[in-house]
Regions:
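Pan-zinc metallopeptidase signature
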Residues: 109-223
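Surface-exposed beta-strand edges and flanking loops
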Residues: 23-25, 209, 226
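Accessible peptide chain termini
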Residues: 1, 223-224
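Basic/hydrophobic alpha-helical interface regions
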Residues: 1-122, 131-140, 151-154
Length: 233
C-alpha cells in the first residue's frame, strides 16, 4: 500500500465514512462538505507528519462542519471553524495532538504561512493573527480588547457559535478600519513657508491614508474548507 493509500484509508477511518479522497497537484488541502470529497496536495518535501496534520484537519471538517449555507463572511468563518474543529479532533482522537503540534512546527520552520520576513506580526489584520496563533505561533500579541475575541474563539462549541463570533469579528474589524480611515481623513493644515527666505524650495507634503485590507462578505454557501496555502509546494 502506497503512502497516499495509507493516508486515504486513515482519513476514512477517522471520518467513520467512506469519503472520497483525492490526491492532486493543488496548493493546499481542502474538504468539500457537500460532495464529501477530501483533497490532499501532492507536495515534494512534506513529511508524513504534515500529511497526518492535513488529514486530521480536513477530517475535522468532515465530522463537525455542517453542510449548511451561512450568513457570515466566509474568511472569518473558516478561521474560527478551524479553531473549533481542531480542538474537537484532539479531544476525539488524543493521538492526533502530537501530529498537530509537530506538523505545525514543521510548517512554521518552512515558512508555510509566508510571514518569516514580516517585521512586526502585530501589524497584520486581527483575523490573520488569530489564525496564526491557533496554528502554532504563541508569540502573537493581542490587545486586551482583542483577547476577548481570541478567548471566545477558543470556547466555541457549535457551528452556530462560530457564525455568531465571525459576524462579531467582522464588525469589529470594519469598525477599526472605519476609525483608521476617519483618522486619515482629518484635514491637516498645509505647512507654511517663509517666502522671504531665499534658497529654500517649497516641498509638497503628502498624507496618504493607510491601505486597508479588504474583508469581503461572501454571499456563497460555505461549502469548501481549505487549509492555508504554502509558498512552495
Amino acid at each position: 500500500m502506497t503512502n497516499s493509500e495509507v493516508k486515504g484509508t486513515l482519513a476514512r477511518l477517522l471520518a467513520t465514512e467512506n469519503l472520497t479522497v483525492e490526491h492532486r497537484k493543488v496548493s493546499t488541502a481542502s474538504f468539500d462538505v457537500n460532495n464529501r470529497v477530501l483533497i490532499l496536495p501532492i507536495w515534494k518535501n512534506a513529511s508524513s507528519i504534515v500529511y497526518d496534520l492535513l488529514v486530521g484537519h480536513e477530517v475535522g471538517h468532515a465530522l463537525y462542519t455542517p453542510n449548511i449555507p451561512v450568513d457570515a463572511p466566509k474568511a472569518f468563518v473558516n478561521v474560527i471553524e478551524d479553531v473549533r474543529i481542531e480542538r474537537m479532533m484532539k479531544q476525539t482522537y488524543p493521538g492526533l495532538k502530537k501530529s498537530f503540534f509537530e506538523g505545525y512546527k514543521e510548517l512554521w520552520d518552512q515558512d508555510f504561512f509566508g510571514v518569516k520576513y514580516t517585521d512586526n506580526l502585530d501589524t497584520i489584520p486581527f483575523i490573520d493573527r488569530i489564525n496564526l496563533y491557533f496554528k502554532g505561533n504563541n508569540t502573537i500579541n493581542f490587545t486586551p480588547e482583542e483577547q476577548v475575541y481570541v478567548d471566545a474563539a477558543e470556547r466555541t462549541k457549535s457551528f452556530d457559535d462560530v457564525e455568531k463570533l465571525a459576524i462579531e469579528l467582522y464588525q469589529y474589524a470594519q469598525d477599526k478600519e472605519d476609525a483608521k480611515e476617519e483618522s486619515n481623513d482629518v484635514d491637516v493644515p498645509s505647512p507654511k513657508f517663509d517666502q522671504s527666505q531665499s534658497g529654500d524650495s517649497e516641498e509638497e507634503v503628502q498624507f496618504e491614508p493607510t491601505s486597508s485590507d479588504d474583508y469581503e462578505d461572501q454571499d456563497q454557501d460555505c461549502l469548501l474548507y481549505t487549509s492555508p496555502s504554502p509558498r512552495d509546494s
